[in-house]
C-alpha cells in the first residue's frame, strides 16, 4: 500500500491565525465550558483558555503563546472552530503544479485546461488513451506538458505518475471533467500557512444546470458535493472524506501517493492515510470547482454501484471507518425497543441515558447533577441524548435504504407490523433532504432518484463484501460508555450515518 508522508502531529497553529466558531459551537458556565464539533464534545477550559476563546470569537488573532496555540489547534482539530483566512491573490505565480489524469475525453480536457490559464505548471497524464494524438494536441494548445502511460493503470497510478514528476511544494489534482473557475486556487492556498495542513479540498458544484430530472437531482445531491459548511476531514467528522476530483496537497504529505491497487475509493483511502499520518485535511466550501456530472441514467447508476464496491476495501484498510450506522448503545437500545413494539421501554432507555449523560457532563461544567433546574449539563444532555434519539430516524432510515434493504424488504413482507415503520424510516431521509435543499425538482421524483441512488450504492456494497469476504461494512458500530478520544474532551453520544458515497 502507498504510504503518506509522516505528518507533524501536534504541531501548534501559527501565531496570528484567526478563528471563528462553528455554527454548532456553544459556550457554557460563563465561558469556562465549550461544546461543539462533530461528533459533539465538551471541553472544560482554564480561565486563561476561556479568555483566549472569548478574544478569538471577537476577531482577535491567536497570540504567540504555546498554550494558546495548542488550544487553538485542539479547537480546529475537533471542529469546534475553523480558520479565518486572508484570501488575496498571490503577488507572483503560485508554487503549485496542477496534475490532470485523463483517458481519452479530449473535449472535457480542453474545457478543464481553459480554466487553468493562470496556473504556472500543468501536467496532463495520458493514462493509455486510445487517441493519444488528440490528448497531446489539446494539452499543447493550453501550454501543458504531457506524460504518457503506455497502458491504462487507473486514476491512482496516473496521479502518482504526475506526482513523481512535480517539483513544487504543492500539487493540485484535478479530474479532467472539472471546470475550474476564477479564484479557486487562491481561496485554498492560504490554508497551507498552517504547517500541519496536508491537503485542502474545494466544494464540487455543477458546471451548468441540467434540465433533465437526473441532472436536477445531481445538481442538488451529488455525492461529490460535501455541503456548505467547512470542516476538518476525517472518519466520523461532518465531512468524513473529500473526493479526489479536486484536491490540493502538500507534496511532502503525499509521500508515495495513491494506492494503485484500488480502482475505486483510492481518493478516500489517500485522504484517510494523510489524517492517520498526522496531517490535517480540510474542506473549504468558500472555494468551488465546477464539475460535469454524469446525467445519463445507466452510466450514473453504474458509477453509484462502483462507489459502493469500495466500501469493503476501505473498511479493511481503515477498520471502523465505513459502517452504515454509528450509534451510542443507548440510542440503539431505544430504537430497538420501539421497533419490537415497546415504545414505552424505549422512552425509559432514552431517559436513563439522558440522566447518565447529564451526570457526566455535570462533572465537566462543575454543576450539581441532582439539581436539573437551570442546569447547562441537563440541557445539553437532553439535546444530545434525548433529542438525538428522536433525530436518529434520519440516519437510521438512510442506513436501511443504503445498506440494509436486502434484509429489510423480506422482513417487511414477512412481518406486517414492520411495513409502516420501515416505509416511514426509508422515506423520511429523502423527504427531509428535499425540504432542506428545495431543489428544482418535485418531491416525488427527488425521493425516487434518492432511493435509486441508495439502491445502486448498496448493490455495490454487498458485491464488495462478497468479493472481499467480509461483512463489516454491513454492521453498525455501537459506542459504549467509554467515549475517550485522542482529542481531549468528553465525547457526547450520538448517531450518524457515514461512509464514502
Outline where the language-model segments fall.
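N-proximal low-complexity "stem/linker" segments adjacent to membrane-targeting elements
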Residues: 3-19, 25-115
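Acidic donor-binding/catalytic loop of UDP-sugar-dependent glycosyltransferases
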Residues: 107, 131-132, 178-191
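Glycine-rich, basic loop-to-helix element that forms the pyrophosphate-binding segment
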Residues: 149-166, 176, 182, 187, ...
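Short, flexible, basic/aromatic active-site loop/helix in glycosyltransferases
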Residues: 202, 218-239
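A short, conserved alpha-helix in the catalytic core of glycosyltransferases
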Residues: 243-249, 253-288
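Short aromatic/hydrophobic "clamp" motif used to bind/position activated sugar donors
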Residues: 171
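Conserved donor NDP-sugar-binding/catalytic core segment of glycosyltransferases
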Residues: 182-216, 292
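Acidic donor-binding segment of Leloir-type glycosyltransferases
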Residues: 113-148
Amino acid at each position: 500500500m502507498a504510504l503518506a508522508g509522516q505528518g507533524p502531529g501536534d504541531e501548534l497553529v501559527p501565531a496570528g491565525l484567526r478563528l471563528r466558531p462553528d455554527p454548532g459551537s456553544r459556550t457554557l458556565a460563563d465561558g469556562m465550558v465549550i461544546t461543539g464539533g462533530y461528533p459533539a464534545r465538551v471541553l472544560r477550559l482554564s480561565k486563561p483558555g476561556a479568555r483566549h476563546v472569548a478574544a478569538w470569537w471577537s476577531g482577535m488573532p491567536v497570540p504567540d503563546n504555546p498554550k494558546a496555540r495548542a488550544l487553538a489547534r485542539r479547537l480546529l482539530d475537533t471542529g469546534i472552530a475553523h480558520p479565518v483566512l486572508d484570501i488575496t491573490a498571490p503577488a507572483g505565480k503560485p508554487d503549485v503544479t496542477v496534475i490532470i489524469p485523463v483517458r481519452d475525453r479530449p473535449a472535457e480536457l480542453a474545457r478543464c485546461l481553459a480554466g487553468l490559464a493562470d496556473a504556472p505548471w500543468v501536467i496532463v497524464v495520458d493514462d493509455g488513451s486510445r487517441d493519444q494524438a488528440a490528448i497531446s494536441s489539446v494539452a499543447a494548445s493550453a501550454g501543458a506538458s504531457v506524460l504518457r502511460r503506455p497502458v491504462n493503470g487507473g486514476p491512482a497510478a496516473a496521479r502518482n505518475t504526475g506526482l513523481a514528476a512535480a517539483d513544487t511544494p504543492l500539487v493540485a489534482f484535478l479530474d479532467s471533467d472539472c471546470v475550474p473557475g476564477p479564484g479557486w486556487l487562491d481561496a485554498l492556498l492560504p490554508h497551507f500557512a498552517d504547517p500541519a495542513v496536508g491537503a485542502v479540498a474545494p466544494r464540487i458544484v455543477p458546471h451548468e444546470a441540467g434540465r433533465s430530472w437526473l441532472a436536477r437531482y445531481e445538481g442538488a445531491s451529488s455525492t461529490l458535493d460535501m455541503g456548505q459548511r467547512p470542516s476538518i476531514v476525517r472518519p466520523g467528522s461532518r465531512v468524513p472524506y473529500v473526493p479526489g476530483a479536486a484536491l490540493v496537497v502538500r507534496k511532502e504529505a503525499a509521500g508515495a501517493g495513491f494506492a494503485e491497487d484500488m480502482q475505486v475509493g483510492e481518493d478516500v483511502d489517500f485522504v484517510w492515510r494523510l489524517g492517520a499520518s498526522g496531517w490535517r485535511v480540510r474542506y473549504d466550501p468558500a472555494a468551488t470547482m465546477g464539475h460535469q456530472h454524469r446525467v445519463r441514467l445507466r452510466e450514473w447508476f453504474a458509477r453509484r454501484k462502483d462507489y459502493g464496491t469500495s466500501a469493503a476495501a476501505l473498511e479493511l484498510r481503515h477498520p471502523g471507518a465505513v459502517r452504515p450506522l454509528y450509534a451510542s448503545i443507548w440510542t440503539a437500545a431505544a430504537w430497538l425497543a420501539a421497533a419490537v413494539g415497546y415504545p414505552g421501554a424505549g422512552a425509559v432507555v432514552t431517559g436513563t441515558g439522558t440522566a447518565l449523560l447529564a451526570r457526566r457532563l455535570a462533572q465537566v461544567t462543575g454543576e450539581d447533577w441532582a439539581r436539573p433546574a437551570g442546569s447547562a449539563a441537563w440541557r445539553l444532555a437532553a439535546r444530545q441524548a434525548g433529542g438525538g434519539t428522536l433525530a436518529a430516524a434520519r440516519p437510521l432510515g438512510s442506513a436501511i435504504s443504503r445498506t440494509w434493504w436486502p434484509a429489510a424488504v423480506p422482513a417487511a413482507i414477512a412481518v406486517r407490523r414492520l411495513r409502516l415503520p420501515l416505509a416511514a424510516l426509508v422515506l423520511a431521509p429523502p423527504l427531509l433532504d428535499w425540504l432542506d435543499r428545495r431543489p428544482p425538482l418535485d418531491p416525488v421524483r427527488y425521493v425516487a432518484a434518492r432511493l435509486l441512488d441508495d439502491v445502486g450504492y448498496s448493490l455495490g456494497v454487498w458485491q464488495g463484501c462478497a468479493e472481499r469476504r467480509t461483512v463489516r461494512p454491513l454492521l453498525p458500530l455501537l459506542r459504549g460508555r467509554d467515549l475517550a478520544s485522542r482529542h481531549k474532551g468528553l465525547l457526547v453520544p450520538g448517531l450518524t450515518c457515514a461512509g464514502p458515497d
